Regions:
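Class I (Rossmann-like) S-adenosyl-L-methionine-dependent methyltransferase catalytic domain
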Residues: 1-47, 57-103, 121-128, 132, ...
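Short catalytic micro-motifs in class I SAM-dependent methyltransferases
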Residues: 116-117
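A conserved beta-strand element that flanks and buttresses the S-adenosyl-L-methionine
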Residues: 113
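Local beta-strand N-terminus motif with an aromatic residue
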Residues: 47, 109-110
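Short alpha-helical donor nucleotide-sugar binding micro-motif in glycosyltransferases
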Residues: 106
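Conserved beta-strand/loop positions that form the S-adenosyl-L-methionine
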Residues: 53
């Protein structure tokens, strides 16, 4: 699917369908975001500038800001950003599909997180997004990406299906754009340091 097709699907999605915990209850949804923000706080430097790309309606961005991080919430869906702003008007938002994140921010950031986003995109689209996310992060900054590897990688067929990658394909992209894989140290998501490309 194209990036625009995925964004259109999110724009039309019922709020109850955007995360499995929301189908349980709003409290479960909120707690899942708080738990992930707490886990991210063990990875990210305290108080750093962090962009939550694919922030949706703020499930992780809002509690991360509550932990003292300087959070910018970024998403390709204005519908999602409007919901976030309604819940947390003090969290700045940026409308972007990720490919132009650096231009939309107008600055480099210390870190980018992107959870449950790349899995919804084709290889080609995800590569373009990851390139855009990397371009927005200062050298030595961090990227925490929900970017799964599988023994039998497969490209998802629709916006709700999951794309998985081979480690070799990930490593080739990382080498080309300047990402160094770090020890995950108990993180469920791969962690990368922004380095000079090549």
């Amino acid at each position: 699917m194209s990036i625009d097709s995925v964004i259109d699907a999110w724009n039309q999605a019922d709020p109850a369908a955007i995360h499995p915990t929301r189908g349980i209850s709003e409290d479960a949804y909120r707690i899942s975001g708080e738990n992930q923000a707490a886990l991210l706080s063990t990875i990210l430097p305290a108080g750093c500038k962090v962009v939550d790309f694919g922030c949706g309606d703020g499930r992780v961005a809002i509690p991360l800001a509550g932990l003292g991080y300087e959070v910018t919430a970024a998403d390709g869906s204005q519908v999602m950003l409007d919901r976030l702003t309604e819940a947390a008007p003090d969290v700045p938002t940026v409308l972007t599909d990720g490919t132009d994140l650096a231009d939309q921010l107008g600055r480099k950031t210390d870190a980018v997180i992107s959870l449950a986003v790349l899995i919804h995109h084709s290889y080609e689209s995800a590569e373009r997004i990851i390139e855009g996310l990397r371009a927005a992060v200062r050298v030595n900054g961090l990227l925490v990406l929900d970017w799964p590897v599988a023994d039998e990688p497969a490209e998802g067929a629709g916006w709700i299906s999951v794309t998985t990658w081979s480690r070799d394909r990930q490593d080739e992209l990382c080498q080309r754009i300047g990402l160094k894989r770090l020890d995950q140290a108990g993180s469920p998501w791969p962690i990368f340091r922004a380095v000079k490309a090549g």
